Amino acid sequence: MVKCDYVYFIKGFFRMEHVNSTPPARPLLEMKGIAKRFGTFYALQDVDLSIYRGEIHALMGENGAGKSTLMKILAGAYTASAGEILIDGEPFPISSPKDAIKAGITLIYQEIHLSPNLTVAENIFLGCEIKTLFGLDRKTMAEESQKVLDRLGAQFLATQKVSSLTIAEQQQVEIARALYRKSRILVMDEPTAALSSRETERLFALVKKLRDEGMAIIYISHRMAEIYELADRVSVLRDGKYVGSLTRDNLDSATLVQMMVGRPLTDLFNKEKVPVGEEVLRVENLSDGHKLKDASLVVRAGEIVGLSGLVGAGRSELAHLLFGVKRATKGKIYLSGGEISFSSPREAIAHHVALLPENRKEEGLFLDLNILKNVTMATLERDATMLVIDQNKGKQTTQAAIEGLKMRVPSANVNVSGLSGGNQQKVLLSRWAAIEPKLFIMDEPTRGVDVGAKSEIYRMMIEMAKKGVAILMISSELPEIVGMSDRVYVMREGYTVGELEGDDINQERIMAFACGAQS
C-alpha cells in the first residue's frame, strides 16, 4: 500500500482511533446566518455552524468555498455583513480580534503569526505582559510559559528565540498562547501543510489531547486522511454556502466529495480518449551530471504522459533540463523532430514549451502582483506593439481564464498572495496556457489543492490534449497518474526504468518499478 493521503481517500483505508461521545445538548459556539460581502461579491451567504465542547469539528470545502473567510469572522479579522455569533447560547458580537480573545477564541493561521526575534515566552504573553515597577517581569513570564509548554510536551524552552524553532514547534507556541489565554475554541487552518509525517503525528496526538480536555477545535483541511483520523463531525461549505454536516459514524468519502463539489467522486478524472498525433518530444539518454543519470521518453501530440517515481528519482531535474533552467551534460532532446538545447526558459517559451513548477510560490507566482499581471507575464512580448503592451488583450485572456477555470475571485485585480492554493495554481496554469504551448510540462499540477480544484485542473488538461498539446505530467499521487495518463514512465534513482500503457497502468506495477521490485 502506498502511503499517500489521496490513495487512502480513494480506497477508503482510514483509521478510526477513538469512539465519538455524544456531544452536550447546547453548543459552545453557534454561527447563525453569517454572510460576508466584498463589494458586490458574496464570499459567504447564510452560513450556519455549531461547535460543541470536547469535539474536533472539521470544516471542509473547495478552495474558495469560504472556510477561511468564515473563520476570520470568528477571529475578528473580518466583520460579518449579516448574521450573529452565540457563545454558550448568548449573543456575543465579534468585531475585532480583541472581542474574539474575550470570547475564548484563537485562530492559528496556515502562515505562522509570531515575532521571530522575541522569545517563546514574550510571544505567549504578547499583548498581556506581566509588569512590575521596573518593567517587564520576564522571569515570571518565562516560568508561566514553561508550565504551559510542559503541559503540551514541548521539547524546547520558553527562553528560546522563536527564530530558532521549527515550524511544528512554532505551532506549539501558538497553541500554548491559546491555552494561557484560556481559549475554549481553537481554530486550525491547514496546520500540517508544512509539517513532516512525524511532526504531523505529534500534532494529531496534541489535538486529540486538547479535545479530551474539553476544548472545541475547528480543523480546516482538504486532506481526507486527516479528517478520518481526527474529526468527530464534519461540516461542508460550497460556493460560500453551508451544505451540511456529517458525524463520524456516517462519514463517507464519496458523500463528502459530492457535498464539496456537487458531483460524484467517479467524475473526478473523467478522462477521455484523445486521438494521438505526431511526436512532439523525444528525450534520449539525458543526464545533468548529478541526480539525473539516464532518462529517455517520448510524448506525442494529444497525449498525457505520466512521469512517476519516488522522491529524489530525478523527475523535477528532467523537467528543468527540458525547460532550459539547467543544461544537460549528456543526451539529446528533440522537439517536433529537431534537436534542441535551450539555454534559458525564455528560449523554451519562444518554442512554445511551458513548465508548471513543483513549488508555485517560490518558482512560479509573483505573489505581490495581481491576477492580471501574473497571467500575462509570459505573453508580454507577444502582446506588445512598438513596445506598447495591448492591455485589452491581456484583460480578455485573464477574464477568460477566470471564467473557464471557475476561479471564485472578485476581480482580476486581486493580489495573488491572498488567493487560495487552488486559485493560485489556476492562475499559473492560465499563464502557461496563454503561450499556446505545444509541450506542457506539469510538475505536481494538483499539489496542495482540494478535490474541486483538482477536477477543474484535470478538465483543463483534457481540453488542452484535445487541442493537440503534448502533456508531460509529473505526479507523486498514484491515483492521478493512473486516472489521467495515456502512458506512464517510471523513474528510479535518476533512470527511467519502466514504461506502462493501457491495462498495465496500475498502482502496483508503478510502485514495483519505482521501488526496484521489477525491471
UniProtKB/Swiss-Prot annotation:
Q: Provide the reaction this enzyme catalyses.
A: D-ribose(out) + ATP + H2O = D-ribose(in) + ADP + phosphate + H(+)
Q: Quote any Pfam family the record assigns.
A: ABC_tran
What EC number(s) does its UniProt record assign?
7.5.2.7
Entry keywords, A to Z: ATP-binding, Cell inner membrane, Cell membrane, Membrane, Nucleotide-binding, Repeat, Sugar transport, Translocase, Transport
What are the residue boundaries of the ABC transporter domain, all occurrences included? 29-264, 275-518
Under the heading CDD domains, the entry gives: ABC_Carb_Monos_I (cd03216), ABC_Carb_Monos_II (cd03215)
The principal localisation class reads membrane
The reply on keyword Nucleotide-binding is yes
**Per its UniProt entry, what is the enzyme's top EC class, as one word?**
translocase
What's the family? Belongs to the ABC transporter superfamily. Ribose importer (TC 3.A.1.2.1) family.
| Subunit organization | The complex is composed of an ATP-binding protein (RbsA), two transmembrane proteins (RbsC) and a solute-binding protein (RbsB).
Name of this chain's protein = Ribose import ATP-binding protein RbsA 2
Query: Which species is the source of this protein?
Result: Pasteurella multocida (strain Pm70)
Q: Which gene encodes it?
A: rbsA2
